[in-house]
């Protein structure tokens, strides 16, 4: 157990699970969408639904969607900032079955017409898990430089992506592969030991059969 696990992150309170973690969920969801959300339909599950409003979970999620960090003093006023930014937000409750008690379903629409559905959980101490993207099961938290590649479920893509990273001396710490159905869309999540050069990311985006590439950089957090 690290000191971070005991003390938690630098944040605007009151709770590392219901506030700091919720901000990070919103922030990473915005990054995965790839642009500023213009609308967000958010459904809270379990403990988030029961006590989230009193702990500021709703405002924290919105703050993250606006690009705020857990220590941003504007978090308590995030609804006002969302209105100024032209972002429409609705809240409800959802039964996500066996999901972690501090979970939320976010259905996002972006200013460029993009749409995305994300299920995420706050695990405590500011740590989170992205549990599903557009119905495809995933499991990552953005605690190290992370590459999320959405591609066609066909042979060769795993080797191609790994080779691109190897050419830049980027070491892959963990790699997880997910797919909705055989031959459909698949998701690769690669957690790396160092930051990935922008030219490498652009090279991956230009590969045939790669549908979307998202990079979670620690330098941006």
Question: Which residues does each PLM region occupy?
Answer:
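A structural-propensity feature for long, helix-poor, extended segments
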Residues: 41, 45-84
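Short glycine/threonine-rich loop-to-helix capping motif typified by GTGT followed
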Residues: 51-59, 101, 186-194
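Alpha-helical support elements that line or immediately flank enzyme active sites
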Residues: 21-33, 155
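Non-transmembrane, aqueous-exposed alpha-helical and coiled segments at domain scale
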Residues: 32-41
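Short, hydrophobic/aliphatic alpha-helical segments
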Residues: 1-11, 40-43
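Conserved phosphate/anionic-ligand binding catalytic regions in large, soluble enzymes, centered on
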Residues: 9-26
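A conserved regulatory-domain signal marking ACT and ACT-like small-molecule sensing domains
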Residues: 77, 91, 119-221
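Contiguous domain-boundary segments centered on the initiation and propagation of an alpha-helix
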Residues: 66-115
């Amino acid at each position: 157990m690290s000191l971070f696990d005991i003390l938690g992150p630098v944040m605007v309170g009151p709770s590392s699970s219901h506030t700091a973690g919720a901000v990070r969920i919103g922030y990473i969801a915005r990054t995965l969408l790839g642009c500023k959300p213009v609308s967000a339909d958010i459904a809270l599950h379990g403990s988030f639904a029961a006590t989230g409003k009193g702990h500021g979970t709703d405002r924290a999620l919105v703050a993250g969607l606006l690009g705020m960090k857990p220590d941003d003093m504007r978090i308590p006023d995030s609804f006002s900032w969302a209105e100024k930014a032209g972002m429409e937000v609705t809240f409800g409750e959802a039964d996500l079955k066996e999901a972690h008690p501090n979970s939320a379903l976010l259905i996002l629409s972006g200013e460029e017409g993009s749409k995305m559905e994300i299920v995420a959980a706050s695990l405590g101490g500011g740590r989170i898990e992205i549990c599903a993207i557009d119905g495809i099961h995933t499991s990552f938290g953005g605690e190290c430089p992370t590459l999320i590649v959405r591609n066609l479920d066909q042979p060769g893509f795993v080797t191609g992506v790994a080779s691109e990273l190897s050419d830049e001396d980027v070491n892959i710490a963990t790699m997880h592969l997910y797919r909705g159905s055989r031959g459909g869309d698949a998701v690769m999540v690669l957690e790396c030991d160092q930051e990935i050069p922008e030219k490498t990311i652009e090279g991956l985006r230009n590969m045939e059969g790669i549908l979307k590439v998202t990079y979670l950089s620690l330098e941006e957090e």
